[in-house]
Each structure stands twice: as C-alpha cells, then as structure tokens.
C-alpha cells in the first residue's frame, strides 16, 4: 500500500524544525570551519528532509546535535538517500570491530554503530525514501549483525580464557546458536523493537586447550550472559537492543542456555501451544548457522503437525482472550499492536493457517507475514479480496507503529494522547489532521477485526464476542452425557426424526463406552463432548438422520484418539454440514473419510471441494507439492502422492454427488488424476534407478531420456476411469537391452528397464499409512502373465503383428500412452495404427469377436437370465448386469472395437481417439453406422456408466433389476445383430 504524499510541515511543527536546524548548524560549526562548509553545501532537498525529520523525531534532532560529524558522514556517503546493499550493514560493523581490544570497547562500538544506523533508518523511513519492507529488513539486518559479530567476538575471547568447548559425543568444537524469535526471526523488526532470543548449543562436553576447563553448559551460560550485557546494558552511549529471554523453556526461571537434546525434549514433552506459535518465526540470527538449521529441523515437528491441527485455533483464541483482558485492564484500547484490529490480529490470522495446515502444506512454513498472506491467497485458503485488506491494514498499522516510535526511539504501540505528538504522527503518515489519520486508522482496524473474527472467533460466540445464549446442540448435551434414561433418550431421538430411535441410541451409547473413547485423554474427551451434541443437532436437519448417524459415527470413533479432527468439525460448521451430506449420499465416501481422516481438510473450502482442477492444473499442483520434498525422502513422496489421489478423488466424488460434474467429466478428472500420478511415479522411479546404476543407452550409444512409456489400456486408456478402477498398463522401452548403463553399478538395459517397471508397480501398489495408489493389472502385455514385464518397442511390434490374438487387438483400440518419452510415444502410436488398420477377413473377424463375447457372457453374465438373452431377462425380478449382460456396456465396446478393426484401414480417422463416445462419432462421420444408431449407442453407454458410477458410490455391484433400461438394451441388441455379430 502507499501512504498519502507528505504535506508541508504544519505550522505547529515549524518552530521545532527551525530550532533543530539552528542547533545542527551550531554543533557543526563547533567542529571546524570545514565541517560547516560541508553542511552549507547540502542541497536544499536534504536540508528540507532534515527539518521534516527533526520536527517529527526528537531522537533524530538530538542525535544530529550530539554527533553532527556522524550525520555529515552519512550524508556524504550517500547513505541517507540510497539504500544499503545486502550484507553492507554487517561489513560496516565487522570493519569497526576489527581492532576492538576489550568488552567495554566492544559495547561502545556496538552502541555507536546502532545509533548511526538508527538515525539513517529513521531518516529514510520518515522521508519515504524507504518502503516498509526496507525499513524492517535494515533493522533486522542491524540486529543480526550486532548479535552475530558480538557473539563471535565474545566466543573467541572466552576460548582464549577457558579453552574451546568440545562435544562429548562428536569430539567436535562447539559454538552457541542464537535463535531470533518474533519480529526478528521474521525479518520484521520495528523502529524500536526489543529482540526475543533463545540460546542453544549442540551437545554436552567440556572445554579443552586452557589451564582451567569448564563444562559446555557453564561455558555457554557465561557467553550468553556476556552477549546480553553487550547488547542490552544501558551506558552513556545508550543501548544496542533490549534483549528478552523469556521465550526460552521455563521462561525466566529456566537455565539461560540449553543443549539441543534438552530443547528437543522440552518441546516434545512440555511445549505449550503459545510456544508453537512463537517458534513459527524462529530463525538462526547468530552463532553456528549450520548447527542452528539442524536445531530448527529437530523442532519443526513440534511446530508443524503432520495432521490437520485445528486445536491451534483454540490456543490462539485463548491467547487473544488473555491479551484482550490485559488490554482492558490496562486501558490499552488505543494500542495498535494488541488492541482490537491491531497488528497482532493479522499475525494470528496468518499463524492460525500456518499451525493448522503447515504440517502438510510446506509452502506455509515461512516466517515473513506478508509472504504467508500471499501464500494463503495463492493456495486458496483466503480470497484475494480478504488478503488485500489484511495486507493493506497491516502495512498501514506498521507505518503508524514506526511513526509513533520515531518520536523518541521508544518501544510503544500506544497512540499518543498529547496533541503535539498527534500532530507529528498525522504529519508523518501524510494526513492533514489527527482526525483524518484516526478515521483511516479506525477503518483499517475495523476491517482487520472483522476478518479476525471470521477466522479465530468461537462459533458459539455472537458478533460481539460474547457467548451466545444457547450454543448449537445444547439440547443434546443431557442425552450424550447420559443424564437421561434410555426411554427418555429414545423419545428425544424419535421426536427429532429418527425412524429407529433405539438403534440410534445404541450407536451413541456404544461409541461413548467403546474402547477408543475410554482410552481418550481429558482434553480429547472434552472435545468429543463438545462435538457430539453439535453433530446430533446437524444430523436431525438431514432428511435421513438414521443413515447419517450410522455412517458418521465410525468416523468419530476412528478419530477419537486424534481429537484435533473433532475440533476441525466443531470449528467449521460448514465442513460438518458437507460431511453429513456426503456421508448420507455415499457409504464409499463415508468409509474413505473414516479410513483417512486427513481428507476432512478438503471439506473446509467449499469452492475447492466442488471445483476439481483441470488436467494441467492437476499436474502442476502435484509437481509443486513433490518439489517441496527432499529427493531422498521417499516415504514422504509416497505419502504425498497418496494423499493427493485421495483428496482429488474425494473432490470428484463430492462434485458428482452435488451434481456439478456430469458423468463424462467425472471420468475425465479421474483419468487426468491417474495420468498426473503416473508421470510423477515414472520420474521418481527413473531418478532412483539412474542414481544407482546410471542411465541406460540406446543402440547408438547415446543415453536414454528415458525412452520408456507407460501405456494405458481399458478404462484409463479409454478415458473412462471410475472410482476404484484398476490400472491396466503395459510398459515399453526403446533402449538397447544389451548395452550397460553408464553409472558405477552398471547393469544391462534389459535389467534396468525391468527394474524400472517393478519400481513403478511398487510405488503404485505399496501399502502405506495412506493406503495404496492403484491396483495394477499387467496381463495385457505381450504374452500376458508369461511375458516379460517390460517389452522393447521392437518386440512389442513383432508380437502385435505375428502373435497377438484378435481380442488383444481389440484391447489395443483403447490403448494410449499415459506417461513417458514423446519420441517413443510417437513410435507406439505408429505401431498401434499399423496393427489396427491392417486388412482383415471380416467374416473371420466377426466370428472371433462374437466367440470372445459369448465366452465372456458365459463366464461373467447373469446366469439366471443366460447373460440377458433368456426370455425372463426383462422381468422386474430378474437382474441386469450393466456391464456383462446382453445389450450392456461390453456389447457396445465390442461393437466399437469390431468397427475399428474392420474399417480403420479405409478410415484412419477412427484411430485418432481411444474413447468409445468419440470413436462412435467417427463412425457416424464416415457413414459406417447410421446417425440414429450412433445416438442410441452413445446415450445407452452414458446411461449405463452413470448408473454404474452411482452404484459404486453406494458400494454396490453394477447390477440393476431387469425392468430397467429395457429400451436401451433392446436397441443395443438390435444393432449388434445388424452388424452380424451373432
């Protein structure tokens, strides 16, 4: 955001500006005549800047007089008008400390350097030469440099006295690690921040190399004490930074310094919610950077839970309530950091999402608040309009905070009550009056507070933040807590709409007394007791409460020991409502969520849930997720792939249930999902094998890249994938099977590609905590189960031309490349076209297709109706197998396959697509099947598949009663006969 332009100095501030100018001139004149000449050579713009800044900031006015030589030097070096390059602050301080002789001198030089930089930073901030980001960055870089260089200097001096601390386990020299917390950690320091620090060291041991040794704990405690003194002590030169150590374990009562093991143990066993919040922004600001990153890695699981963690909202809400109580107690409503709509509320909003989702969405594991807000927008957690308001309000508040602190270099966020200071703050912010400034400030605070309440507020509070008179589900509390006898409980359930009230009561009682609930800790039990009444209240709003309760309670039992999921649903009534709707519509969805509760996350965002992404977006999203995971972390890669598949599968099912996705699009999305996963699985498997064995070679000796394709047959090849469909795959390579790979542990090409195929199958079928990706069927490869797992392109072509049965050519109609090398894909498509289009004896072809179809009906069709051919097949008491009986799905597929094999030689356009609907369109365009018959076949095919999809969502077989689809079946049988297929 941008502030209003700086106006002319208000009349009230003109005397202060004149006094400051006169005092500066006198101070410079007292130096020498040359100094005065240098001042008089200042351009008018700089003199005007000085008058403005000095009138607005007592600190600048006083320091300019106290050390006018410093101000002249800053001006002549261009530091007032130009930004510092990265690393420049550190370089300047390093040069100033080079010949530092003792600790007193260290303190003096640090303080003078801080004063110099503080003056420069305030000058640039108040003259608008520096944007907010630069000001915060420079202040944080100043703190980093002072902390790290002072720590380095003191460590060196202490080693001379007591020897070098050595790790007992590693035998390596040890250095202290300084973690910067809060605004320092996030590179967001304000003009007069204190700095929150935590000290650690890698491991216990003792010093070596001096007459008197210390154990490492004592060595680093002394070092920490000296560092605090060097930075925090107030002397005639002022201070460097106020140091706050209260964020360390046990606060002020705990040791000053901790070993890494002690820190990890503390946070694992005793870490509190507010400490997770504080640790989000932790950054290594001094000491051993490499060891510090190791420490942060050890603590990351404490901060970011791998499951959805809505308990974070409870913690943030509690913290906010405590802050509000303190604000009210101390009359701090005018505090722009802690008051309503203040800076802290924006931070809480961002950190709520980080703590809830950051364990799974690694893009949220970052420190700067504005970057987090951008990620929340980019990843769809918050709408752009909300992020724009939060960003604008936050920046306005931070500018105002700097304006207040610039007055006297004092740590405060309270709006001034003094009229003179109010005029100064309004002037700095670019407003003509305090009233105009305060009106804009109030606007931003109101917007921030409104958004804060949407994210953090208790769902049982009203808009004022007070507890609502009757929280949702309060009428069900006595029943759940068994304050009612069984008869009264059943009556309440029946009155609320349950058909079988006794069964509903038994289910609730079984849950309450079941082993999962009995084993819950107190906090989890409290969460369950808060959730179940809310669940019952929303269940009775559904037209099928018995069914909903039956399907949802297994989920409640499944997550009982991970009660954060109960908090998620309690905190998000919309998500709970969507859960009940989906469970009522589909037992498959209910069981999937109960088995993988992490899917509850998908229910939070209604827009995302019912709008699955397009193919390119799917692939890009998966690629981005995997790129955030270290290449050697196979376990996390496998889990990410599985969660991605589960999440998007749920989104497709939800869209199907809601009616926002038609059948053809459902299959498209599920097919695209499989394709995106196969592309990444191939990449993972290829990378692993190449790292171990090197790359396989082509016949000309050049390396393969990867010269391998995954071919999809059946439903995935025909873009007709369904929920729970298997992958029918064939692997083909075009490398040299005899040539050895070019790596250290070389193997021949045939071995390499076989192992590549095995690894792909393993990645797809391996059982992990998030289940498997897909079941894989490789029986359509050349020679079936007896054939090689991976065929060379040449071998595949020879097999198709010389050995393949007609039914294998039928299968080839639906075959297409899903992932792999474009060159080999083009070669495969050429082989496919050549094989399918070759001339055939049509009588022999009809016989072979008919015989194969008859064999399938005999084995897979409904026996009681002779696979739909008997006279009773159309009776209501009969069963019709949508796929295998006469007039069903397979009949249509066989007709399409017959047509391609019979006529694609003369009509090559029939080979363009692999899905039945578009091949039928091609047959119509070629005049091979009448338009009316094509419409009949297409509509019947879509109707059958839609019914099969609906049954799959109900976990039922693809069978309906014989009275269904009678017209469609008869027409399909008629067309089958007209094609003389038996």
UniProtKB/Swiss-Prot annotation:
GO molecular function term, any single one: ATP binding
Residue ranges, annotated region (Adenylyl removase): 1-460
The keyword Phosphoprotein is assigned to this record: no
CDD domains in alphabetical order: NT_GlnE_GlnD_like (cd05401)
Gene Ontology biological-process annotations: regulation of glutamine family amino acid metabolic process
InterPro entries: GlnE, GlnE_rpt_dom, NT_sf, PII_UdlTrfase/GS_AdlTrfase
Region (Adenylyl transferase): 473-982
Gene Ontology CC: one annotated term: cytosol
UniProt keyword Kinase, yes or no: no
Residue ranges of coiled coil: none
Pfam families, A to Z: GlnD_UR_UTase (PF08335), GlnE (PF03710)
Entry keyword set: ATP-binding, Magnesium, Multifunctional enzyme, Nucleotide-binding, Nucleotidyltransferase, Transferase
Catalyzed chemical reaction(s): [glutamine synthetase]-O(4)-(5'-adenylyl)-L-tyrosine + phosphate = [glutamine synthetase]-L-tyrosine + ADP; [glutamine synthetase]-L-tyrosine + ATP = [glutamine synthetase]-O(4)-(5'-adenylyl)-L-tyrosine + diphosphate
EC number(s) recorded for this UniProt protein: 2.7.7.89, 2.7.7.42
Family indicated by similarity: Belongs to the GlnE family.
Function: Involved in the regulation of glutamine synthetase GlnA, a key enzyme in the process to assimilate ammonia. When cellular nitrogen levels are high, the C-terminal adenylyl transferase (AT) inactivates GlnA by covalent transfer of an adenylyl group from ATP to specific tyrosine residue of GlnA, thus reducing its activity. Conversely, when nitrogen levels are low, the N-terminal adenylyl removase (AR) activates GlnA by removing the adenylyl group by phosphorolysis, increasing its activity.
HAMAP family cross-referenced by the UniProt entry: GlnE (MF_00802)
Annotated protein name in UniProt: Bifunctional glutamine synthetase adenylyltransferase/adenylyl-removing enzyme
């Amino acid at each position: 955001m941008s502030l209003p332009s700086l106006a002319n100095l208000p009349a009230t501030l003109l005397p202060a500006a004149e006094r400051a100018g006169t005092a500066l001139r006198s101070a410079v004149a007292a130096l020498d005549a040359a100094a005065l000449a240098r001042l008089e050579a200042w351009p008018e713009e700089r003199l005007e800047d000085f008058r403005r800044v000095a009138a607005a900031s007592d600190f600048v006015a006083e320091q300019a007089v106290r050390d006018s030589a410093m101000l002249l030097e800053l001006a002549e070096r261009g530091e007032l008008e130009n930004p510092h390059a990265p690393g420049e602050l550190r370089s300047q301080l390093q040069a100033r400390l080079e010949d530092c002789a003792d600790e007193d001198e260290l303190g003096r030089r640090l303080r003078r350097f801080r004063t110099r930089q503080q003056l420069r930073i305030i000058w640039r901030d108040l003259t608008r030469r520096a944007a907010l980001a630069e000001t915060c960055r420079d202040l944080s870089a100043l703190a980093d440099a002072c902390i790290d260089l002072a720590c380095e200097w003191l460590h060196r001096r202490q080693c001379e006295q007591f020897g070098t601390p050595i790790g007992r386990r590693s035998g390596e020299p040890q250095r202290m690690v300084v973690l910067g917390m809060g605004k320092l950690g996030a590179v967001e320091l304000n003009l007069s921040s204190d700095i929150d620090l935590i000290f650690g060291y890698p491991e216990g041991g003792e010093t070596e190399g001096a007459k008197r040794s210390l154990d490492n704990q004592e060595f680093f405690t002394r070092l920490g004490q000296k560092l605090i003194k060097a930075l925090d002590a107030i002397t005639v030169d002022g201070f460097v930074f106020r140091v706050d150590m209260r964020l360390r374990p046990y606060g002020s009562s705990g040791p000053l310094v901790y070993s890494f093991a002690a820190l990890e143990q503390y946070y694992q066993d005793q870490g509190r919610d507010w400490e997770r919040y504080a640790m989000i922004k932790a950054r290594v600001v001094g000491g051993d950077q490499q060891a510090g990153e190791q420490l942060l890695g050890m603590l990351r699981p404490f901060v970011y839970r791998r499951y959805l963690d809505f308990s974070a909202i409870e913690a943030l809400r509690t913290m906010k309530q405590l802050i509000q109580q303190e604000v009210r107690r101390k009359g701090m409503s005018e505090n722009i950091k802690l008051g309503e709509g203040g800076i802290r509320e924006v931070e809480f909003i961002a950190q709520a999402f980080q703590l809830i989702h950051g364990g799974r969405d690694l893009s949220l594991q970052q420190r700067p608040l504005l970057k987090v807000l951008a990620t929340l927008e980019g990843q769809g957690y918050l709408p752009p309009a909300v992020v724009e308001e939060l960003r604008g309000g936050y920046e306005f508040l931070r500018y105002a905070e700097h304006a207040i602190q610039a007055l006297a270099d004092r740590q405060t966020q309270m709006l001034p009550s003094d009229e003179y200071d109010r005029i100064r703050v309004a002037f700095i912010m670019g407003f003509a009056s305090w009233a105009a400034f305060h009106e804009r400030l109030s606007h931003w605070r109101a917007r921030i507070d409104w958004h804060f309440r949407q994210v953090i507020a208790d769902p049982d509070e009203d808009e004022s933040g007070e507890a609502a008179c009757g929280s949702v589900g309060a009428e069900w509390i006595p029943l759940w807590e068994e304050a009612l006898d069984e008869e009264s409980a059943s009556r309440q359930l029946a009155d609320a709409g349950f058909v079988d009230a006794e069964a509903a009561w038994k289910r609730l009682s079984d849950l309450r007394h079941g082993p999962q609930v009995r084993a819950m800790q107190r906090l989890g039990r409290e969460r369950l007791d808060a959730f179940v009444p809310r669940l019952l209240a929303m269940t009775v709003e559904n037209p099928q409460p018995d069914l909903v309760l039956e399907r949802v309670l297994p989920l409640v039992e499944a997550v009982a020991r991970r009660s954060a999921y109960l908090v998620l649903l309690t905190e998000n009534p919309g998500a709970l409502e969507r859960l009940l709707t989906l469970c009522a519509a589909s037992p498959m969805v209910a069981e999937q969520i109960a088995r993988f509760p992490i899917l509850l996350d998908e229910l939070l965002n209604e827009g995302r849930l019912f709008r699955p992404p397009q193919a390119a977006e799917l692939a890009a999203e998966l690629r981005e997720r995997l790129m955030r995971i270290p290449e050697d972390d196979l376990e996390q890669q496998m889990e990410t792939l599985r969660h991605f598949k589960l999440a998007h599968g749920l989104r497709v099912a939800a869209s199907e249930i809601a009616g926002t996705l038609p059948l053809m699009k459902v299959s498209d999305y599920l097919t695209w999902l499989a394709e995106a996963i196969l592309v990444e699985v191939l990449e993972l498997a290829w990378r692993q094998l190449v790292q171990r064995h090197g790359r396989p070679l082509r016949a000309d000796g050049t390396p393969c890249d990867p010269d391998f394709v995954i071919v999809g047959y059946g439903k995935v090849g025909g873009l007709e994938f369904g929920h729970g469909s298997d992958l029918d795959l064939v692997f083909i390579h075009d490398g040299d099977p005899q040539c050895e790979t070019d790596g250290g542990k070389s193997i021949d090409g045939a071995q390499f590609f076989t192992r590549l195929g095995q690894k792909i199958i393993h990645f797809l079928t391996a059982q992990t905590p998030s289940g498997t990706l897909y079941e894989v069927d490789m029986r359509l490869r050349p020679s079936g189960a007896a054939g090689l797992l991976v065929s060379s392109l040449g071998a595949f072509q020879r097999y198709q031309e010389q050995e393949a049965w007609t039914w294998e050519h039928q299968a080839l109609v639906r075959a297409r490349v899903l992932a792999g090398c474009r060159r080999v894909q083009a070669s495969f498509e050429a082989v496919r076209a050549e094989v399918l289009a070759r001339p055939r004896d049509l009588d022999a072809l009809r016989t072979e297709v008919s015989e194969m179809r008859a064999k399938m009906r005999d084995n897979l069709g409904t026996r009681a109706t002779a696979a739909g051919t008997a006279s009773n097949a159309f009776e209501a008491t009969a069963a019709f197998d949508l796929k295998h009986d006469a007039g069903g799905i397979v009949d249509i597929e066989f007709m399409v396959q017959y047509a391609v094999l019979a006529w694609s030689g003369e009509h090559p356009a029939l080979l363009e697509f692999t899905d039945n609907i578009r091949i039928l369109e091609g047959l119509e365009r070629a005049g091979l099947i009448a338009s009316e018959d094509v419409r009949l076949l297409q509509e019947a095919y879509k109707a059958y598949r839609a019914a099969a999809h609906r049954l799959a969502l109900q976990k039922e077989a693809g069978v309906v009663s014989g009275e269904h689809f009678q017209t469609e079946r008869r027409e399909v049988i008629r067309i089958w006969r007209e094609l003389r297929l038996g």
